[in-house]
Amino acid sequence: MDRTPGAAGPARVDATGWGWRHAGRRRPAVQDLDLRIHAGERVLLLGPSGSGKSTLLHALAGVLGGDDEGEHHGRLLLDGRSPADARGRAGLVLQDPDSQVILARVGDDVAFGCENLGIPREETWRRVRDAIDAVGLDLPLSHPTSRLSGGQKQRLALAGALAMRPGLLLLDEPTANLDPRGVAEVREAVARVLDRTGATLVVVEHRVNVWLDLVDRVVVLGADGRLLADGPPSVVLDERGEALAAAGVWVPGVPLDV
């Protein structure tokens, strides 16, 4: 685990009867969620399309928006605080590599989040170098981001999140748009980051097999946005695989009902 000064420890998540309904929608995206994720746990979040997985990740990152964007009920806490009040405690990486590259040079792009948090320049660039090393992106800080592959761009996004020293790492289908080489690069980078930082992980992914040996828990949301299953991967996928597939969840080796 990272013991350097200013490094955040792993975060914990507590949801009690939590739900969210997007503005203009009748049905909540997530509803009546009771969930506790302990500091340092590694969770694979599954569910059919529209079950609220991305909504939950955005809520944990504190970027769902205000009252004009929707309404919530219950409580969702990150280290005992509202995620919106825990700025910098959660780092979110999305599925589209191109949409996450902001600046023209590798170093500047990784530094962007730290600068927004008001971290001093000297500390920011120390974090940038540490983060780039952690994700295995062996490139000079001046390297053009336009010349990166898809897998390299996702590792760049991961480095940008890591530089902010989050206690909770949120990955929303990070390999969805990558070829097999890019998938392997990102998965290996995440494993290195977790080994180095001990951060809590929540990853949403349809490529379940990529993450099974890295996570210690599987949480499943149903089509109605409610908690459907929660437990060790072997229990959830092996013992409940057919029932989950019938509910629209992709499970390795079990055909979906269509």
Residue ranges and their predicted role:
Residues 61:
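Helix-to-loop junction immediately C-terminal to a conserved catalytic motif
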Residues 122-140:
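Conserved ABC ATPase "signature" region
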Residues 144-148, 152:
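Conserved ABC ATPase signature
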Residues 161-162:
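ABC ATPase C-loop
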Residues 165:
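Conserved catalytic motifs of ABC-family nucleotide-binding domains
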Residues 169-172:
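Catalytic Walker B motif of ABC-type/P-loop ATPase nucleotide-binding domains
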Residues 205-206:
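H-loop/switch region of ABC-family ATPase nucleotide-binding domains
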Residues 224-249:
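Conserved beta-strand-loop-alpha-helix hinge in the C-terminal portion
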